Amino acid sequence: MRNRCILPVLSFVMLCTAARGVAGSLTCDTKSISFTDGYAGWQLLAADGERDVTRQARYESGNSAVARVDVNGHVTPIADGSTLIRIQHDGDKLEIPVRVQGAGADRPVDFKRELVPLLSRMGCNAGGCHGKASGQNGFKLSLFGFDAAFDRDAIVNEARGRRVFPAAPDFSLLLLKATGQLPHGGGKRMRRDGNEYRLFRSWIASGMPSSAPDAPHVVKLRIAPADRVLARNGQQQLAVRAEYSDGSIRDVTRQAEYASNLDVVARVDADGLVHTLQMSGEAAIMARYLGYVAVFRAMVPHGERLKEIAEFRPANYIDDLTLAKWKKLGLRPSPLADDAVFLRRVTLDLCGRLPTAAEARAFLADTAADKRAKLIDRLLDSPDYPAYFAMRWGTILRNSNLAGSTNAAYAFHNWIKDSIARNRPYDEFVRGIVAAAGEWQESPAINWYWQSRDDQLHQVTADTAQVFLGVRLQCARCHHHPYERWGQADYYGLAGFFTRLGRKSFGEPPPYFASANVTTGEKDPLTGKTPEPKYLDGPSAKFTPEQDPRHALVDWMAKPDNPFFARALVNRLWGHFLGRGLYHEVDDLRETNPPSNPELLDALAQDFTKHKFDVKHIICTIVNSRVYQLSSEPTPHNKNDRQNYARYYARRLPAEVLLDAIDQTTGTRGNFSGVGSNARAVDLPHEGFGSYFLDTFDRPRRVTGCECERSTGATLAQVLLLGNSDEIESKIAAGDGRLARLMKEKKPLGDILEELYLTAYARRPSAEELKRTLAHLEGAANKQQALEDVLWAILNTKEFMFNH
């Protein structure tokens, strides 16, 4: 019973009117409040329909000697007894019964559960203050409070105990600095009349006790409301409640930390009040408390809610679920892209190349209603599809020659390409990598392990989580993840699946094998023992000496109810084809980074699992959707949309694709040593092929499994290279290039221009473009040079450099 008294037991019913309320539209999320100690608090949420009026309502306590309520609806206990909190707004009234017990009881303050969250909220244990590796001015705390015992020792025992003074708590250095009574680099962090000061003072006065080992602990954090559609320049008060292992609930609205993932849409203050700004869109507001997180989603519509969008005709469930979101947000989509734009887009996305002029002519002339679907099937059946996606997978799987074995890098590249060409089920593809063993000639995927040989256990653990599960687990190696639920136990639990992996002492790469006799020397810092396998967010696993735990790990990944595996892959594919993942970034699936359309993500993941991890099926579903086929031209209704796919998001071509596009348009080939003369840049098996162009346009170095290593941003060096480099000039003027061939064939200037436009843009020049360009050419003394200028101009247009 003593531990139960540490926490206030409070009951609440979401959005229910109090029993003694006067009839009207005013509601409160709380039916009654029951406090069991004097350190508690409770945030009321008042609403008028769906509109938050917490900060507009008036509050009054029937007996302020028992409980007080401030102007923002926050209730605090004062003394034992019962009273009513009256809420008034626009003539409506509510009364919330409040009962207080134990307000005067001198119960101990729990350091971990009550003070560590305050240190986090005040920023004391952040990386820029006492939480950094070296501490600050001789005082170091654990980063984000992940080690409460360490923090207590630092406060109580370090520096000969000078930070606390139990005999006269108010003169403790900890409180004097935090209240600004003594100089403090971090400034004033608390008020002497505040609840934070009361808690710290009481703890010091009682002798700075350690946290009771059997005290209730947080099991879940909830935020109310979970989401809201808010107007521009609107506001919403949040309430955060922690559920404890003994069944009790504590309001921690004023102890939690808050952050917005999109400040241009919505901001949040220290007390959980969300303010929306002028920008429409969606923002996720994170609340963090004792390592747990909860998220509120603020949706700011682009316009009034729409009943119908008659001009958009769904083709599959992707369109249905996206359409529902547009209606909710008042978004009208752009029209469908025309045939030329679609042909170029889907060929680039599926094959990493431009359509040929012949392909463009045939597609534009085709009048069949299903020609787009047939085109998609042809492209997926072509050898260019596995070649392009082998490059993309080789990048995030870090297939590199940096490890010293070019032959193994070639073999791994070919293994990936063959798996894609055969449409190998994704779970089998992952098993071939994660559970790879043997010699590289028979098992090329061991090169994935060989790339990590200097820090194998940790690199493989981090890559497995990020690449195949979409979880960035690296932070949890050293401390609890600041924006997720993952801690060191989760990290080392996943690492435990790889502790039996060993390698021979010969060969590059050497043969790999799994054995219970392998000793990594790595210890779990929490236990001091070899990491034991534990499924992420799941149970521990036990294996016999003969078993390879990695196979069990893949079995767990492929289970239909796995919350990460299928979602990670469909989100990665969605990001590739639509320019932005439903989770953004595509390999960062976490609660505090929620998907822009969770219903769509779930539907894609379920479809993927239902079809036995058929990657081609999901790709077909995505690119056959009307959402994928929308124009990139914004309309007045969607010009500010960045999250909901009301138009196609244009993006610069990746380095390898752009170089190949230039070669294709100019009729030249890249000159890469060690590969065939017909090899494209996307065919290169690793990053070791020298190319100033590829490096300038941010070809990944393949040193990380993160998609973020590839950049499609613009730099001055890129502009200068395209506009004024010998490399581009030589391709345009090549004697065996496209222009030279067309001139030798004595093609009419109009035909030459059509060929260039069809090759570069998959469309014919408009009448105005043709008129202006022909006028330029016909007035030029040197037709060859004038055509070279035209081609150079084409290569420098956004229409060429971007997939749109």
Task: Please give the residue ranges for each predicted region.
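Proline/serine/threonine-rich low-complexity linkers at boundaries of modular beta-sandwich domains
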Residues: 20-25, 209-220
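Solvent-exposed helix-loop boundary motif
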Residues: 35-39, 47, 65-78, 83-90, ...
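Positively charged n-region of N-terminal signal peptides that target proteins for export
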Residues: 1-5
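Catalytic cores of secreted or luminal carbohydrate-active enzymes
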Residues: 190-210, 717-724, 728-733
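Bacterial N-terminal signal peptides
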Residues: 8-17
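N-terminal edge beta-strand
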Residues: 24-32
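Short, structured secondary-structure elements
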Residues: 128, 141, 145, 151-156, ...
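Short, intrinsically disordered, charge-biased short linear motifs at domain edges
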Residues: 108-119, 459-466
